[in-house]
Amino acid sequence: GTQLAAAEVGGFTKYIETTDPKDYQSNIEQFASKDYDTIVTVGFLMAEAATAAAAEYPNVNFIGVDQFQAAEVPNLTGLVFSEDKAGYAAGYLAGLMTQTNKVGAVLGTDTVPPVFLFGEGYRNGVAAANPEAEITIVYHEPNNAFNDPEWGAAEAKKQLTQGADI
């Protein structure tokens, strides 16, 4: 979608996938220091770095996806979505698609409200579509909750061995 939008207005896109939170600021800096018109940062964990960069580069527009800005910053717009509704839609689809009546979800920590809301929406969506379905939702412990693919893979495999097909 981003690439199509850029093409429509004669622009272009570049991106960096950050694997370590300590790199957020320097990765944003790579674009901001080159006078990009707009920089999009994704994820609530990047909110602090995006806010700092917006203050340092007032002539660059910043968009923070899943980032709530408590204070108004003229060149920074936070986009926050209804996680429970997205979770409900995903859960409803899972409830319709399951052949085993066992569905699961492997999520980040439930101490982060959007993650918890997504999980509850998922649970409610499955139940609405398929009241007979068993639902297993697991949350990571708060430490390193969004950068632990080994844990996620192990939990998903566990659910699969217990009969979950979604």
Residue map of PLM features:
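A residue-level marker of the well-folded mature domains of exported/periplasmic proteins
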Residues: 1-166
